[in-house]
Amino acid sequence: MAETQADYTSLLEVLRDGAARAGMLERDARSALYADKDTGRHRALMEQRAQTLIDLESRTADLLNALPEAERRQTRSALRAFADGARTALDLGSVFYMSALLYRDNHKAGEPDKLQALVEDLETRLR
């Protein structure tokens, strides 16, 4: 049980780190665009954010094995969807698509994005 709890902790740390990095890159990109009027830096930061989502899928691959089957499938599916969307956004070169990767259509300011919600849900279920 202690080993499983340590695995959960490791997984949650990687997910929290990825969510924090994605959020930081998004805030920095927004600042580059609106405060600095630097569209090149904005694009570069959004590309880094997309790459962060792609990397998160591979960084968690082995750690997901510690989860019970239902949580493992659900989490793997969500991370794959984030990564696939990020790959598509990068392939298209669409900054708009990159900016929308983690948000529901009806997202409201101040609400957690889909990655943050996934982390919060896992934290609750793994207690």
Name these PLM-found stretches:
Residues 25-41, 60-70, 93-100, 126:
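Secondary-structure edge/capping motif, primarily at the C-terminal ends of alpha-helices
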Residues 80-127:
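Amphipathic alpha-helical binding modules
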Residues 18, 22, 49-53, 57, ...:
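Alpha-helical transition-metal enzyme core signature, strongest for iron centers
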